[in-house]
Regions:
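Residue-level recognition of single "structural anchor" positions
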Residues: 1-199
Length: 199
């Protein structure tokens, strides 16, 4: 589906921006509700990663936890769907419960070398890593290129917005997740999925 700005929608529909904002907010709330229902992953090959959204990187601060940014955790089933959520931080204590709640034991998980992923094997997963800090981005089938493709897509979308409050950020994030997951659907199917799927 097309991804118009509010100004473009206003020009097409002749509605004022306040009305458009109200309608879009209702749609995003519905999308967020549906996204939670779709977010359970079956067994398979899953890529997991984190990314940071928001303020520009502060000089002198590098890596995970860069000041002023919002941490987002993501899981992508290869040849399937993505799930993303805002997290307080990217520690093992925060990420492991999400992983265990979304991915069945016995699945194969691909990650980078972040220490929060230590212990996945002990929790019943097959775990393969690539070490970006050693300029390793793929080893055979082991890589996180799929989830990184989603991060690139999401950040291109967010570059259009001039700052978002925390509650609006989450809704836009789930909209981005939904658009990615249904990117091959035609518009009619997309609208039907949002508004006519039973709770």
């Amino acid at each position: 589906s097309e991804d118009f700005t509010i100004l473009q929608i206003a020009k097409i529909t002749k509605l004022n921006r306040k009305t458009i904002n109200f309608i879009l907010n209702k749609i995003r709330i519905r999308i967020s509700e549906l996204a939670e229902k779709e977010s359970y992953f079956t067994q398979g090959e899953i890529e997991i990663d984190e990314s940071y959204f928001g303020a520009r990187r502060v000089r002198g601060r590098r890596g995970r936890g860069a000041a002023g940014k919002t941490p987002v955790f993501g899981l992508l089933k290869r040849n399937g769907k993505v799930f993303v959520t805002v997290v307080p931080n990217c520690s093992r204590e925060e990420l492991m419960p999400i992983i265990q709640g979304k991915i069945l034991e016995g699945s194969t998980i691909h990650t980078d070398g972040w220490k929060a992923y230590d212990g996945l094997i002990l929790n019943g997963y097959n775990h393969y890593r690539v070490f970006h800090h050693e300029n390793e981005f793929a080893r055979g089938k082991s890589h996180v290129n799929g989830i990184e493709c989603f991060w690139s897509y999401a950040k291109r979308r967010f570059s259009k917005f001039n700052g978002l409050t925390d509650d609006k950020f989450i809704l836009h994030l789930k909209e981005t997740e939904c658009r990615f997951n249904h990117r091959s659907d035609d518009f009619a199917s997309f609208i039907e999925h949002i508004f006519f799927i039973k709770n």
